């Protein structure tokens, strides 16, 4: 029986390309090579596509995916040249142009099956302001927030923050993930510098109420009504703020899997996770991040439609705790991608 082709897209145009490379390298090592051939394509910061490597067997531990200058010495190809009949694409891409619906729309035009969120679920979860409206509509609790726009009066925005929120607050670009561009603000004097930093990444910003809470995460897997959620895990920080470097570069975090929570609280988190996932028409996978306060209040922080897939990432570790290995998880995601593709094609008839 001939092997199936799994195409890995990695790199990308966003500030989160480092995470993408780390995730893609983990995937290429964990793939079941008795079933798949893996073909890799690097997307440069400028948006060019470069065919890099091809693996028919598990690569050596020291082998790395080509990136940046090394990859750019390879010939650039037309983006459409990644097409291969019956191949499945795993877009291991984070942030804008990766999990905002852009690459998903491109792959649908090519009529390729792909792992993860569709156009709607990608774009709606990537946009923090839109996501907040959706989750509010289905009754999933969230922390209070203020919306800010770069072209509005910044003094009036500051006044609204003072009236509606208490410090500390967190200032977040509406369309960015992995803590990129996010600042913790302890007083009014630091608000404008934090807004200026966030506006570098998006002209729409969310200012959220800070809460003294545990950070609890739940992994979701499935399509349509057949959706499963894991027991939750907890992010245990030894840094003051769980920023981009502490998440992915310095690895200054630890995780408790499963989280030390009551059965009732775990069930509530799982139900909120599945409700939020279905509300945005989730497909394939998502990681739902929650705050849990000392008095037991649960707030949804965000739904991450393409969560980190590195060897120390919460999403695969949560499923491993449920008995689903990393390699089997990848196969399940490929099968879900093919199922979604068939459904989409049938709806076009």
From Swiss-Prot:
Keywords of the record: ATP-binding, Cell shape, Cell wall biogenesis/degradation, Cytoplasm, Ligase, Magnesium, Manganese, Metal-binding, Nucleotide-binding, Peptidoglycan synthesis
EC number: 6.3.2.4
PROSITE patterns: ATP_GRASP, DALA_DALA_LIGASE_1, DALA_DALA_LIGASE_2
Annotated residues for binding of Mg(2+) 2: 302, 304
Residues covered by the ATP-grasp domain: 132-335
Binding site for ATP: 162-217
MF term (GO), any: ATP binding
Functional note: Cell wall formation.
Protein name: D-alanine--D-alanine ligase
Organism encoding this protein: Lactococcus lactis subsp. cremoris (strain MG1363)
Name of the encoding gene: ddl
């Amino acid at each position: 029986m001939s092997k199936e082709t799994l195409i890995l897209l990695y790199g990308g145009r966003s500030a989160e390309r480092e995470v993408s490379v780390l995730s893609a390298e983990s995937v290429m090592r964990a793939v079941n090579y008795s079933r798949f051939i893996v073909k890799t394509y690097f997307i440069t910061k400028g948006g060019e596509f470069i065919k890099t490597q091809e693996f028919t067997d598990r690569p050596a531990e020291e082998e790395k995916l080509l990136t940046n200058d090394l990859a750019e010495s390879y010939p650039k190809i037309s983006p459409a040249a990644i097409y291969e009949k019956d191949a499945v694409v795993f877009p291991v891409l984070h942030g804008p142009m990766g999990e905002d619906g852009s690459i998903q729309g491109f792959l649908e035009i090519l009529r390729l099956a792909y792992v993860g969120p569709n156009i709607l679920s990608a774009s709606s979860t990537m946009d923090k302001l839109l996501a907040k409206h959706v989750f509010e509509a289905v009754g999933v609790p969230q922390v209070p927030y203020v919306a800010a726009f770069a072209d509005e009066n910044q003094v009036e925005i500051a006044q609204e923050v003072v009236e509606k929120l208490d410090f500390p607050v967190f200032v977040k670009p509406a369309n960015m993930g992995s803590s990129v561009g996010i600042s913790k603000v302890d007083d009014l004097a630091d608000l404008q510098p934090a807004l200026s930093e966030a506006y570098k990444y998006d002209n729409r910003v969310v200012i959220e109420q800070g809460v003294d809470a545990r950070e609890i995460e739940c992994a979701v897997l499935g399509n349509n009504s057949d959706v499963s959620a894991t027991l939750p895990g907890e992010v245990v920080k030894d840094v003051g703020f769980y920023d981009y470097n502490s998440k992915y570069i310095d690895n200054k975090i630890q995780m408790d899997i499963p989280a030390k929570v009551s059965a009732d609280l775990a069930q509530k988190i799982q139900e909120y996770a599945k409700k939020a996932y279905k509300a945005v028409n989730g497909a394939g996978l998502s990681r739902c991040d929650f705050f849990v306060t000392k008095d037991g209040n649960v707030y949804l922080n965000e739904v991450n439609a393409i969560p980190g897939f590195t060897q120390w990432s919460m999403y695969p570790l949560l499923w491993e705790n449920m008995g689903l290995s990393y390699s089997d998880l990848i196969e399940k995601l490929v099968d879900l991608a093919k199922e979604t593709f068939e459904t989409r094609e049938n709806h076009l008839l």
